Regions:
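Short, conserved glycine- and acidic-residue-centered signature motifs
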Residues: 104, 125, 129, 180
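GNAT-family acyltransferases
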Residues: 1-118, 181-182, 189-203
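Amphipathic alpha-helical segments that line or abut small-molecule/effector binding pockets
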Residues: 39, 126-138
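Conserved GNAT acetyl-CoA-binding A-motif
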Residues: 138-148
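Conserved catalytic-core motifs of GNAT/GCN5-like acyltransferases
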Residues: 146-149, 166-186
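Conserved active-site alpha-helix within GNAT-family acetyltransferase domains
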Residues: 122, 126-127, 151-169
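Conserved hydrophobic/aromatic "anchor" residues
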Residues: 33, 135-137, 165
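Acyl-donor binding region in acyl/amide transferases
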Residues: 110, 117-118, 122-123, 127-130
Length: 203
């Protein structure tokens, strides 16, 4: 008699995904979204460079009603974590960090971040990535966090490398950019790696 294969064990979504924490660093504070963030994101998403770096169609974030509906629903999500990035020096919301695409059996998530012009070139993005990746491994008990970064965004890739993300491979010509095509690099960081360097692999 053939044995009937057992059903795979599906790891439930962590309860911690329902908790939207406040994470405090030296330069940035990550917190749940508030109503006032909508105006900040409308300005950020209207920036042509932001639209290009994120692969978003021009004008996609210009509708305040759509933005308000989106960001007002982020704190209620139970299978992902969306947090606003706040510059502690000014109190301004300058971007966001997101852990999404939860894969229960493999304890993995996708990561993405968006930092507007007001938050660039001062280490805010690097610290924000470290804070949320650390939370993902230490509180959400993730095993793997992955991302994709476009070839025309070396600044973002350097940030990810500083935190310990490792390039795994290339997705060829995944984005139409003007008259050409752009590749993207797949990067990831694993829980055992984080346990060793805690976001400072080159220290």
């Amino acid at each position: 008699m053939r044995a009937v294969p057992s059903s795979p064990t599906i790891r439930p979504v962590p309860v911690a995904f329902s908790v939207k924490p406040t994470l405090i660093g030296e330069r940035v504070l990550l917190r749940p979204f508030v109503d006032d963030d909508v105006a900040a994101f409308q300005a950020v998403l209207a920036d042509p460079e932001v639209a290009r770096l994120t692969g978003s169609p021009p004008g996609e974030g210009s509708d305040p009603g759509r933005l308000r509906a989106w960001y007002s629903s982020r704190n209620a999500q139970t299978d992902r974590l969306d947090l606003a990035v706040v510059d502690r020096a000014t109190g301004a919301c300058v971007g966001e960090v997101v852990l999404n695409e939860w894969d229960g059996p493999n304890r993995s998530c996708n990561f993405r971040t968006l930092i507007g012009p007001a938050g660039r070139d001062r280490g805010l993005g690097t610290e924000a990535v470290r804070l949320v990746v650390g939370y993902g491994f230490e509180r959400l008990e993730l095993h793997r966090i992955s991302l994709e970064v476009f070839a025309f965004n070396p600044r973002a890739r350097r940030v990810y490398e500083k935190v310990g993300f490792v390039a795994e491979g290339m997705l060829r010509q995944v984005l139409r950019d003007g008259g050409g095509w752009v590749d993207a690099t797949v990067m990831s960081i694993l829980a055992p790696e984080w346990a060793v360097h805690r976001g400072h692999p080159h220290s």
